[in-house]
Amino acid sequence: MKRSLLALALVAVLPFAAQADDKLSYSYVEADYVNLDGDADGYGLRGAFEFGDSGFYGLGGWRTAEIDGTNIDVDQWELGVGYAHGISPNADLISELAYDKVDVEGFDEDGYRASVGVRGSFSPNFEGIAKASYVDSDDTDGDFVGTLGAQYKFTQTWGVVGEAEFADGGELYTVGLRASF
């Protein structure tokens, strides 16, 4: 039901979208709805900040979800750095390294994520990302994660984002609103 309402809201505002800029921005704040494997719902905040024209950017995020039918919360936060290397006027090769922390009802796990991917602008209003990551932590074996995402920009500042992460242990879906600057 929640997904249907989100999809309906997105479709309703698409005709009113203004022309947006096609420059890829690595400075943004974002609020997301989070769905973990269809078994947990929650919300999150993410952001990034470009360090001038160097190609480097800092990134961070926090999300929380409650497992359906329980009072068990899953909290995660990450802090890291990334680098974007232009491979064409509308596409960047990106690499990221981040520290991750996950807390499930008092069980804390520290880890890291190393990612490489491509982010590109398909049109002035639409961009996509494909990323491969290796994630490892204290008490678990490492895992590879594939990420596919997109952003539809209403204006140079505002856009709607969606992302799906696929791993051996499950999927994570996010839909949110992004303000780029």
Regions found by a protein language model. Give the residues of each.
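Outer-membrane beta-barrel proteins
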Residues: 2-181
